[in-house]
Amino acid sequence: DGMVIDLEHLSNEAEQIKEKGISVTPDNLKLSKHATISMPWHKVQDELEENRLSATGSAFGSTRRGIAYAYSDKYRKKTLRLADLLHLDNENVKARLKTILDAKNLELAGCYHQEPMSYPALLSWCEKQADIFRDYICDTGIFLNNALADNKKVVLEAQLGAMRDIDYGIFPYTSSSSTIAAYGPLGAGIPYAPLNHIVGVLKAYSTCVGAGPFVAENAMSEEWQKLLRKYGGEYGAATGRP
């Protein structure tokens, strides 16, 4: 429920999995209707703002995948959720999409001098995503609660450490969501489910990518840093940065 989803990236991942002979169907992949959509302008904004900050030496080291901007628009209520894709023929949904785009075009034009995005093109993009994912969208909270009622085991997986948590991490050099275990049930739509086991995965040494303070980096020589990167494969999964 609490995720933001890059549907184009998800579609590409699903195709890669299928190419390896693994089926991807609504039976083994379910998307929460409450999840927030990463819209086409989110990556554009991320790229433009990171370039602007880089010019002054104050960039955050963003992956430029639009994550922060998707979460920002989620809390500003200026984006769509997956459930909206199921009702694109509804005039209220269309009107809301148009209103959101009008506001976003003002931001892009006023802050970054960009040409406005087209509403027909945006609606077409939404319709394409709806065609691909319609059968996968459901109330995952009900699905998981039913599984718990049947005494089935539910595993919640997340990434990033506590220091990247938006509330408890090294703000502002954090992710844009909560990374701690306690948020797991809430984000999954099962807020009252107890966490019976918490498993933390640690490496022998700490690493991080992006800008911001990192004590361990200052404690070792540049030669050691290069060795760890080389033999540990310490490069960002999304960007390839050291």
Feature-to-residue mapping (PLM):
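Non-transmembrane, aqueous-exposed alpha-helical and coiled segments at domain scale
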Residues: 1-242
